[in-house]
């Protein structure tokens, strides 16, 4: 713990930005944050659900059109001891000019227009070590690969290649309050060229509408139980998304067809995934957002499942206090996970956040966590 604190102080002592005087010289930018997060179960035995502190450092080196970006964490986790230590987040080299944008290395790749739901956005897997009781950006796992994008005024074309796939991080240790149990997970695909992921996305930005088409040859990133063992298999995703502003509203839509997707039990079948979302910027610092995602699997008895989200946020006290509720609603089984938070900015760098996570479910995806409702507090200092 002492070494983590010392390195944290060193990070904070580094100047936030060092800028060269001419464009052809090397430019260096250093920034990051220190945060600490603690959560307690509201039901008996009122134990700690999470207790972790972190230093995040981000360094950008740039000269001309080329550069490199590295972000890393130093973590102390009082509950999950194996999570304590150094964690490389992203590390990639890039080249960017008026039309070309190339990134090679460990990076987070996002597709689609869905908010905290995965339809076409299936390249970067998820860290479910604490399920969804983390910031969504922290849940994404970077992948090592190449991303090439060519942009024009009204469209761009993106191609991706991931030689070695990354997969969901699932909590199976009983010492973790978020454990799903001792589920055996099969071997990940061998590191061979024929197992690489590849795909592309074509996006258009027109007056009154943005839309895109995407395709990806990939794997099921979350293991599927087959004869009691979690397995990974090949699948292909074909998708499209759109976003349309209408006055104070934004209408979002997304659809993804998963071809030859592995189903529970080992069968393979196509599945259709569709989402409709509506954002309302109501004025007076109010924002409301609702989504409904539906999945149809062309196999078995339970072919249809539905999941909704609802986000409501309001800024108060000259935008120093941000109130928000974000809920996942299991339409199929009636469960809900609702994260409420109050974020108060003590100054431009220091934030204090108080929150409550509510789980309520008798069956379905949230039932395993029905006793995990928690009260949490977070402090964050940015530098």
Predicted features by range, described:
Residues 22, 28, 59-63, 94-97, ...:
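Residue-level signature of outer-membrane beta-barrel architecture
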Residues 32-38, 70-74, 104-106, 159-163, ...:
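Transmembrane beta-barrel strands of outer-membrane/channel proteins
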Residues 51-57, 88-91, 142-146, 196-200, ...:
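Hydrophobic, lipid-facing positions within transmembrane beta-strands of outer-membrane proteins
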Residues 60-177, 207, 361:
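Outer membrane beta-barrel
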Residues 65-70, 100-102, 154-157, 208-211, ...:
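Repeated loop/turn-to-beta-strand initiation elements of outer-membrane beta-barrel proteins
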Residues 243-329:
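Detector for outer-membrane/organellar transmembrane beta-barrel domains
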Residues 312, 356, 371-383:
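Outer-membrane beta-barrel "beta-signal"
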């Amino acid at each position: 713990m002492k070494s983590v604190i010392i390195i944290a102080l060193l990070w904070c002592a580094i100047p936030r930005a060092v800028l060269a005087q001419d464009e052809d010289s090397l430019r260096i930018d250093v920034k990051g944050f220190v945060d600490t997060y603690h959560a307690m179960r509201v039901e008996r035995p009122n134990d700690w659900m999470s207790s972790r502190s972190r230093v995040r450092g981000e360094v950008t080196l740039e000269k001309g059109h080329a550069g490199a970006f590295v972000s890393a964490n130093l973590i102390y986790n009082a509950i999950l001891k194996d999570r304590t230590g150094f964690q490389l987040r992203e590390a990639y080299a890039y080249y960017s000019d008026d039309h070309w944008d190339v990134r090679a290395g460990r990076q987070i790749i996002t597709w689609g227009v869905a908010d905290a739901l995965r339809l076409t956005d299936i390249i970067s897997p998820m860290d479910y070590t604490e399920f969804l009781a983390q910031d969504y950006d922290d849940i994404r796992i970077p992948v090592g690969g190449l991303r090439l994008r060519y942009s024009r005024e009204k469209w761009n074309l993106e191609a991706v290649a991931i030689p070695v796939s990354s997969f969901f991080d699932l909590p199976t240790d009983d010492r973790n309050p978020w454990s799903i149990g001792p589920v055996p997970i099969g071997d990940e695909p061998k590191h061979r060229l024929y197992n690489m992921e590849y795909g592309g996305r074509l996006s258009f930005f027109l007056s009154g509408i943005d839309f895109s088409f995407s395709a990806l040859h990939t794997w099921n990133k979350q293991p599927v139980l087959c004869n009691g063992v979690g397995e990974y298999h090949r699948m292909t995703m074909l998708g499209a998304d759109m976003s349309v502003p209408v006055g104070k509203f934004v209408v979002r839509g997304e659809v993804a067809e998963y071809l030859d997707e592995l189903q529970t039990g080992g069968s393979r079948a196509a599945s259709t995934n569709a989402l409709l979302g509506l954002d309302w910027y109501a004025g007076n610092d109010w924002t409301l957002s609702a989504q409904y995602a539906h999945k149809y699997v062309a196999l078995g008895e339970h072919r249809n499942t539905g999941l909704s989200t609802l986000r409501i946020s309001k800024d108060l006290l000259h935008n120093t206090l941000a109130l928000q509720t974000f809920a996942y609603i299991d339409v199929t089984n009636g469960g809900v996970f609702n994260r409420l938070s109050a974020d108060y900015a003590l100054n431009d760098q220091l934030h204090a956040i108080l929150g409550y996570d509510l789980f309520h479910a008798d069956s379905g995806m949230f039932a395993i966590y029905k006793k995990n409702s928690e009260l949490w507090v977070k402090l964050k200092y940015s530098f």
